[in-house]
Amino acid sequence: MADPENTVLVLGLGDLGQRVVDVLSHRPGGRLVAAARDAEHARSVAGQAALVAALCGGPRTVEPAVVDLAEPDTIAELLVRLQPDVIVLTASRLTWWRVPERARVLPYGAWLPLHVTLVRSLMEARNAARVAAPVVALPFPDAVGPVLAGAGLAPETGAGNVLEMATKLAVVVAERAGVTLEAVDVRLVAHHATERIAFSAFGGLGGDEGGPIGPPPLHAGVSVSGEAMPDDEVRELLTAAYPLLSGPATHELTAAATAATVWALLSDQPRRLHVPAPAGRPGGYPVRVSRAGIELDLPPDMKEADAIAVNAVAARWDGIERIEPDGAFVYCRWVSDALERTLGVRIERVEPAESDAIADDLEARLARV
């Protein structure tokens, strides 16, 4: 956000959204807009962030905005008025740490319809507003991106997930090798489902109702000062215990990953990063990011089709058997069985036209658990 003319819009000011605004307020930039449905809450978040920005040399201006993310027309009006350079969507209809205790037997992928709704609403609004700003969508991007890609509504990228795992690898390897982070090169192809084996703080996201045996597939390449590390050592370090706070406190990490993605999207020079769902691909990838866009930066020995295949299979550890080219998705059978036992509804396949109705039904059933 170094350019004083840049505008970054953050949509949704729940726990994660507030933390994203806070991290963005610590670095120089132009205008930071914090938008929520509740006007008083938006004013409070923006007001505090404005003081932080003043103290830390952050954005030139921080201001609130009011928007209902369930209404594409009002989103479009806001986008036309603000003309943002980057849009960050943090809001979802279901937050992972608020899933009722009884429903936590289900994997994260069971709630995919609840994550699709607001992202699609934003993408439709952006199209209507004819705004070109890239969207960084945080609700379950590894799966939401490919679901919406079938309709041409995939956000440019997600944030967090694979970047958090890649950063863990870089930090642990640098510490072990006694080198700076700059000497460590990490290229990780990994799905959201892998994060719970990299960080025990996310272990509960897999549920406990069956599922595939063993860890999800991934591809991890690490080199130190140009020397490649053995694959088995890399995997050992990726899955080694690592201390993290629990619950929503981990949103601080996701907020930092989101800010890194935003700053890269505002940079004239490409920055090496990892992101989930670039251009609607499933799972996460190493990339080069700049104002010009996002390009894959895969390991030299890996083709794009192979990387996509790794993540498509890994999605089964989140309970998603497959995502069709048109955006329909199929639950793994064990998830359909668990939904029936837990919530009294059996869902095997979700067509794009059915997604909102199924999301409404899941939301209502969760409220009764």
What are the functions of these language-model segments?
Residues 67-82:
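Conserved Rossmann-fold cofactor-binding substructure of NAD(P)-dependent oxidoreductases
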Residues 121-127, 131-219:
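Rossmann-like dinucleotide-binding core of oxidoreductases
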